[in-house]
Regions:
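Extracellular lectin-like interaction modules
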Residues: 1-292
Length: 292
């Protein structure tokens, strides 16, 4: 059963109605798309759509054209990502600005009705903090976008106040476009300071791991022409375990680490080679969470 949170393409289903599929074959796919909309309508969103099945399924979500948060990005890419079941959600998440990005946003979705989410934002430059609470009154309800701006170094802690009500956090980012990609017009050159959009489901702290494999592939057509592109791995671990984290068998440089607003934890943006290459991050401590 699928219960979309927005009217679907072609007016086939209205928000809140149930789509029932009774005879999907192995390997068969079913697409639910939001209704047609104007270019400026950024509120078209299927966030919080509920999907239930009596047999194992894989669910992928994404969008057709993405400018997060700016249409000025020179590559408004398609984005598709596999969703995870509620069993893999959590109640405590830690976010920071990501290296080589312009503006970041996070969205938090509730698994159950009446989930109270606490959002603590720290300005690491001034030491000030701000706490906000959002009540998500329905299962699948999503918070307004949580801005994590690059103008100040920010650290964010997101918690579900009720430990029995897990949440899921999507982190949306726009790369810095340090290559200043330009196009010529009849009147002037237009240069774009925002790069490709991307998204990632941020792992909850309870789902930390002992190892993480990754692969980097330089794909920017302007990479190396003006300013080389950069790859980073973002990891967060217990402060006492920073010396137990390794990248490809070697210790992670201590100067990469910063204390998170929760001083029991530290995070690092680890530079990776600008080459087609595999990498392995491992911990002999209590584990870590990370994205690339």
């Amino acid at each position: 059963k699928i219960v979309p949170t927005f009217n679907t393409y072609g007016g086939k289903t209205t928000a809140g109605s149930t789509i029932t599929l009774t005879n999907l074959s192995k390997g068969e796919a079913y697409l639910v798309a939001s209704k047609e909309h104007e270019r400026e309508d950024f509120m078209v969103d299927l966030s919080g759509t509920t999907i239930c099945s009596d047999k194992p399924i894989a669910v992928f979500n994404g969008n057709q054209q993405t400018g997060i948060p700016n249409r000025e990005a020179y590559s408004q890419d398609f984005m598709v990502e596999q969703s995870i079941p509620i069993e893999q959600w959590g109640t405590e998440l830690y976010l920071t600005n990501l290296e080589n990005t312009r503006i970041n946003y996070a969205l938090v979705t509730a698994a159950y009705a009446d989930t109270k989410v606490e959002i603590v934002t720290y300005n690491a430059e001034t030491g000030s903090s701000e706490t906000n609470s959002v009540l998500l009154d329905k299962a699948g309800k999503t918070t307004p976008p949580i801005a994590i701006n690059d103008s100040k170094r920010k650290e964010v802690i997101i918690r579900s106040v009720d430990p029995g009500k897990p949440i899921l956090c999507y982190h949306y980012i726009t790369s810095a476009a340090v290559n200043k990609f330009c196009t010529s017009t009849a009147f002037d050159d237009i240069c774009y300071t925002y790069g490709d959009p991307a998204s990632a489901m941020m792992p909850a702290w309870t789902h930390r791991v002992q190892s993480m494999n990754m692969f980097t592939e330089p794909l920017d057509p302007q990479g190396g022409v003006k300013t080389p592109q950069h790859f980073f791995a973002y990891v967060i671990t217990k402060t006492e375990d920073t010396d137990k984290l390794t990248l490809n068998g070697g210790a992670v440089t201590a100067t990469f680490y910063r204390f998170h607003a929760n001083n029991d934890l530290s995070y690092a943006h680890i530079p990776l080679p600008n080459t087609s290459s595999y990498h392995l991050i491992e911990s002999s401590g209590d584990g870590f969470i990370g994205t690339v």
